[in-house]
Amino acid sequence: MKPGLPKTRKGRLQAALAVLASMCAVDGFFVEPNWIEVTHYSLSAPVAAPLKIAHLTDLHTKGLGFRERRLLQLLRQEKPDLIVITGDTISSTANYEEESVVLRELHAPLGVWLVRGNWENRYTLRGESEFYRANGVHFLANRSAAARPDIWLIGTNDSANWSAEVERAFASVPENTYRIALFHSPAFFSQSRARYDLALAGHSHGGQVRIPFWGPLWLPSGVGPYVHGWFSSGGTRMYVSRGIGTTLLPVRFACRPELAIITLQPMAN
């Protein structure tokens, strides 16, 4: 073996690792955060007619940037009947004005519906209901409403750091309707799952940064075992979306942002 060969191999290894690290950095900071994945799911449900739901969560928007414009483009292509947003549209008080620009661009025949996340609870907006109403959004804070006569939406405050008043939220929901619960922190599923048919949640960002063969680098409190995807218990199902935006650092790795499209199909007789 030539005396200089080990050094050459070491140098090549270091160079390869540097290239790999650079590629991961480019992917994590510039590619993945803007590379929205559209996921499609179909559920058989006791509903009168099909319903196509677009589930958004964790926008953490700062206005109409590239990612938001791409999201709007995808929504126009999907043409959902209903858009639901399960919290964390902002990251600071200053973002509300920027958020309004995005909210005004969201449209669906059965409306846009929103619940608080932990960031809205941290930076509570005075005149919150009026703000959302002015931007064409139905705000569900521990209350319910009919999306259609056979389908009711129930929105609760984020249970991680606010009062989720379950009794109040479900008080006016008629019997024999399909119930869709909207909340931010998926760990709430363990406390409330017997009351509805389907739940939609976010908060986890899917981990945001996932290490291959390991999993999420970090998860916030309020996630529990419900990091991403479908979960079921006692006939109730929940979907946890990876969300659209980022927090702490503007990076995603092995965890693309997600627009979840869930279609309810009438059950066969």
Language model feature labels by segment:
Residues 1-47:
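N-terminal membrane-anchoring alpha-helices
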